[in-house]
């Protein structure tokens, strides 16, 4: 039995004067049709008196049907276990819909309280009509348990026969990707078409309006410009694919102050930590290409720690110690979480494919290298060492041994030159094949005036992936700081390094009273700040996108 929504006397009666509020509602026709389909079981006396706007386009009506159906399913039937507490929302949950009404005063971490009054009025009226998601779910659940029988229901609504009752009432879909399990997406076309005319959610651009002040936060501007629906994450939703690559000013890592208020005691530290990882997602402003300086050693002294790469996947710590104990007592450091190197593999995880061997003497390292196969790289004069090792399931596998010559940690071009820390930059994300002399040569070619370069090392005098470069003039220093990211291309590797001002322990340069552990590298500030002065200085919108720098406390503790 076909069910028509066009010529229905019930629908016409729904718009008479018995429900005066409904006659002035912009969604009156849609609500009446829904009420008719549900057997006039809905009480429409509380419908808002929003004036009808015939010419205003709804942004949701321009979206593909597949996206809309999935959003409606999530709006009308939210998951019971969904957490509505404040926090960083998942990109898949930006179709807020009715779920947002359960939050008092729209207290989203990114939303501004200075919103348009007309929008607030519409939001309040919608809340009065539809209630909270739980109330709406209870109404529909009570209706499904009423006296109407299953046979009568299917005769009255034949389109509902295709619906899965479990997914209809207990939909847990939180993403448009899961829309196949949604009741509305797989059910009646009439109901889907009907709901397309309802405005039951504020537009996504309105929700994101206050975030436009900081173009570096999550790159929302570029995401909203995609041809796909803003409710559906693009394929390149990873940080490296979705963030813009702009500089100067600040790191463009996702702003963690979305999770915390600006006064949170950990938000600045989190921003500084994220900035130290920014080289992987920012484009280089300078590129250096060429050959590294040749190396010539006479009786080199090695660090007692070596890198062992390409180890068998099933290797164990006992197997490593048994293999290398003939060269002297040693311990094994496995790559672990949070930049640490625990003495055993992470539980439940496979080894990472490389380990560090720590001997008690550099003589053990020298003996190990003598038993390795040496591959000399020309013209750099850099040797690669390979050691044949076996495991229970792999036989005779070449593992690369990378030692470190202690003299490679420092390079001074002019011993009589006084080193000024105010003209020193920090260089992060260094490649393991870069020694101090090579770093100095590259920086001097790009910026000029290099008098010193040093590679940061741990307690075993093994490099940790960062270094320092000192210039003899401020112009070269500022040019290097402004460059921020430099790509180094050699015949053996290509690596992008990150350049920041070298930080010292300093007093806040704003109040001159408290310690200033936070440094703003933007040229409009370029000062050390204490926590309160940082918030005071950067509370203005024009400065809110500045990101802090901090000294690496873990590195200092390791040394």
From Swiss-Prot:
Tissues expressing this chain: Expressed in oocytes (at protein level). During oocyte maturation becomes detectable at stage Ib, and remains ubiquitously distributed within the oocyte cytoplasm until stage II. It then follows a gradual accumulation to the future animal pole during stage III, and remains localized to this pole at stage IV (at protein level). Expressed in oocytes, blastomeres and pre-mid-blastula transition embryos. Its expression during oogenesis is ubiquitous at stages I and II, but gradually accumulated at the periphery of the oocyte in the presumptive animal pole during stage III.
Domain of life: Eukaryota
Protein's gene: cpeb1
Residues the record lists as binding Zn(2+) 1: 508, 511, 530, 533
Domain called RRM: residue spans: 304-401, 423-504
Family statement drawn from the similarity comment of this UniProt entry: Belongs to the RRM CPEB family.
Free-text function comment from the UniProt entry: Sequence-specific RNA-binding protein that regulates mRNA cytoplasmic polyadenylation and translation initiation during oocyte maturation and early development. Binds to the cytoplasmic polyadenylation element (CPE), an uridine-rich sequence element (consensus sequence 5'-UUUUUAU-3') within the mRNA 3'-UTR.
Name of the protein described by the UniProt record: Cytoplasmic polyadenylation element-binding protein 1
Keyword RNA-binding: yes
Swiss-Prot/TrEMBL keywords: Cytoplasm, Metal-binding, mRNA processing, Repeat, RNA-binding, Translation regulation, Zinc
GO terms, molecular function: metal ion binding; mRNA 3'-UTR AU-rich region binding; mRNA 3'-UTR binding; mRNA regulatory element binding translation repressor activity; ribosome binding; RNA binding; translation factor activity, RNA binding
Pfam family, one: CEBP1_N
Location of the region described as Disordered in the Swiss-Prot/TrEMBL record: 222-243
Compartments, record wording: Cytoplasm
GO CC, one annotated term: cytoplasm
Alphabetical list of CDD domains matching this protein: Bbox1, RRM1_CPEB1, RRM2_CPEB1
InterPro entries: CEBP1_N, CEBP_ZZ, CEBP_ZZ_sf, CPEB, CPEB1_RRM1, Nucleotide-bd_a/b_plait_sf, RBD_domain_sf, RRM_dom
GO biological processes: cellular response to amino acid stimulus; cellular response to hypoxia; cellular response to insulin stimulus; mRNA processing; negative regulation of cytoplasmic translation; regulation of mRNA 3'-end processing
Residues that bind Zn(2+) 2: 520, 525, 538, 546
Species whose genome carries this gene: Danio rerio
């Amino acid at each position: 039995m076909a069910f028509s929504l066009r010529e229905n006397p019930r629908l016409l009666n729904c718009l008479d004067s018995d429900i005066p509020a409904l006659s002035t509602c912009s969604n009156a026709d849609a609500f009446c049709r829904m009420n008719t389909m549900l057997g006039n079981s809905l009480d429409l006396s509380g419908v808002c008196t929003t004036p009808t706007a015939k010419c205003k386009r709804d942004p949701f009506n321009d979206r593909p049907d597949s996206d809309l159906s999935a959003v409606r399913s999530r709006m009308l039937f939210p998951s019971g276990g969904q957490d509505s507490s404040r926090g960083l929302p998942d990109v898949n949950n930006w179709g807020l819909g009715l779920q947002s009404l359960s939050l008092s005063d729209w207290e989203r971490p990114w939303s501004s309280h200075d919103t348009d009054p007309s929008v607030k009025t519409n939001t309040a009226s919608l809340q009065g009509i539809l209630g909270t998601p739980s109330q709406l779910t209870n109404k529909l659940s009570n209706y499904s348990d009423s006296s109407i029988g299953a046979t009568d229901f299917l005769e009255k609504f034949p389109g509902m026969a295709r619906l899965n009752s479990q997914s209809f009432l207990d939909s847990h879909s939180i993403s448009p990707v899961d829309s196949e399990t949604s009741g509305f997406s797989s059910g009646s076309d009439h109901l889907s078409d009907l709901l397309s005319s309802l405005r039951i959610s504020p537009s996504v651009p309105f929700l994101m309006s206050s975030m436009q002040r900081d173009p570096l936060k999550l790159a929302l501007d570029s995401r909203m410009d995609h041809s796909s629906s803003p409710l559906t994450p693009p394929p390149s939703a990873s940080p490296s694919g979705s963030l813009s690559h702009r500089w100067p000013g600040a790191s463009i890592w996702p702003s963690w102050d979305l999770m915390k208020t600006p006064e949170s005691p950990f938000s600045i530290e989190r921003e500084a930590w994220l900035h130290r990882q920014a080289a992987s997602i920012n484009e280089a402003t300078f590129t250096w290409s060429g050959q590294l300086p040749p190396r010539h050693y006479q009786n080199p002294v090695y660090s007692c720690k070596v890198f062992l790469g390409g180890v068998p996947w099933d290797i164990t710590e006992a197997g490593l110690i048994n293999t290398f104990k003939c060269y002297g007592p040693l311990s094994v450091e496995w790559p672990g979480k949070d930049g640490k190197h625990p003495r055993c593999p992470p539980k439940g995880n496979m080894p990472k494919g490389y380990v560090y061997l720590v001997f008690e003497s550099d003589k053990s390292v020298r003996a190990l290298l003598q038993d390795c196969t040496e591959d000399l790289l020309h013209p750099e004069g850099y040797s690669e060492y390979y050691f044949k090792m076996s495991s229970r399931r792999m036989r005779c596998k070449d593992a690369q041994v990378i030692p470190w010559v202690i003299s490679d940690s420092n390079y001074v071009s002019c011993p009589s030159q006084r080193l000024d820390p105010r003209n020193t930059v920090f260089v992060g994300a260094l490649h393991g094949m870069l020694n101090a002399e090579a770093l100095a040569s590259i920086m001097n070619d790009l910026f000029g005036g290099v008098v010193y370069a040093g590679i940061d090392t741990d307690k075993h005098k093994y490099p940790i992936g960062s270094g320092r470069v000192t210039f003899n003039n401020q112009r070269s220093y500022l040019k290097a700081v402004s460059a921020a990211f430099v790509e180094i291309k050699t015949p053996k590797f290509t690596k992008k390094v990150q350049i920041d001002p070298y930080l010292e322990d300093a007093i806040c340069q704003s109040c001159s009273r408290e310690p200033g552990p936070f440094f703003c590298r933007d040229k409009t500030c370029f000062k050390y700040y204490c926590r309160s002065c940082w918030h005071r200085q950067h509370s203005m919108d024009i400065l809110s996108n500045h990101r802090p720098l901090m000294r690496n406390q873990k590195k200092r503790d390791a040394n």
